[in-house]
Amino acid sequence: MNKKLHWKSLGTGTTNLILIHGWGVNSKIWSILVQSQLYQHFKLHFVDLPGFGHSNQLLPMTLNDTAELLSVYIPKNSILLGWSMGGLIASKIALNYPQKIKGIISVCSSPCFIVRPNWPGIPKKIFLKFYNKLNINFDRTISEFITLQSHNTNYLEIKNLKQQILSQPYPTIYTLKKNLETIFKTDLRTKIKKLKIPMLRIYGSLDTFVPKKIREILDILWPKTKSITIAHASHIPFVSHQKEFYESIINFKNYLNTLKITCQK
């Protein structure tokens, strides 16, 4: 029985890129990156979050505890890349352990996923309905989730992605629900505003989970961060729009190199 965090490193580059997956899936969501140009530019670190994939024997943790656990594995001067819920985790790591982090990339994520006064997001009623209907049919839930969020994506690539994800150990319903609770209650809008680490935010113009209005608001709230929206992309742009996605990641790495950043003391 494996009760350790599953962590795998690949790539020929010298810059550490930590890939943090989102809700319901595992590190296989990034499988397409292994064959990409990112492999030459970065040392890619794939992690299965507590309760997911080959870390499924670990109980789900709070956002703080997850950040603490991952920080033990993260090399100094790393770039964090968090997708969806993984963006919350990446942000929390950067807030709690800035001395290790060179930059943050948030992909189709939000500091606050749920709608609030003067803030767009997922309506509470819709979120709670999904939470209450979550059942043991994990295959169907994840398959439908990926399909709905994969507009303009090659059918065979999506089929292969589903197979890769579902080939790994499944999370429990308890894990799925505890992570949904974390998404529901987390609001990092004010805290991230104070973060001094360079940040890139990537959005998809057709993303139904993270409304495009969020980019416009955060461009004002967080003027020191960079942002791009990939046209015609939904919630999984690293699969549907690989060229644009890879270019944005490499350009951000090159930008960080011009700053000659060494991590905060």
Curated annotation (Swiss-Prot):
Gene3D superfamilies in the cross-refs: alpha/beta hydrolase
InterPro entries: AB_hydrolase_1 (IPR000073), AB_hydrolase_fold (IPR029058), BioH (IPR010076), Carboxylesterase_BioH (IPR050228)
Keywords, ordered alphabetically: Biotin biosynthesis, Cytoplasm, Hydrolase, Serine esterase
Catalytic residues as annotated in Swiss-Prot or TrEMBL: 84, 207, 235
Catalyses which reaction(s): 6-carboxyhexanoyl-[ACP] methyl ester + H2O = 6-carboxyhexanoyl-[ACP] + methanol + H(+)
Tree of life domain: Bacteria
Keyword Protein transport: no
Residues that hold substrate according to the record: 23, 84-85, 145-149, 235
Keyword Cytoplasm: yes
A cellular component annotation (GO) from this entry: cytoplasm
Pathway note: Cofactor biosynthesis; biotin biosynthesis
Annotated localization: Cytoplasm
Any one GO MF annotation of this record: pimelyl-[acyl-carrier protein] methyl ester esterase activity
A GO BP annotation: biotin biosynthetic process
Predominant place of localization: cytoplasm
Top enzyme category: hydrolase
Family stated for the protein in its record: Belongs to the AB hydrolase superfamily. Carboxylesterase BioH family.
Assembly: Monomer.
Free-text function comment from the UniProt entry: The physiological role of BioH is to remove the methyl group introduced by BioC when the pimeloyl moiety is complete. It allows to synthesize pimeloyl-ACP via the fatty acid synthetic pathway through the hydrolysis of the ester bonds of pimeloyl-ACP esters.
NCBIfam families linked: bioH
Protein name: Pimeloyl-[acyl-carrier protein] methyl ester esterase
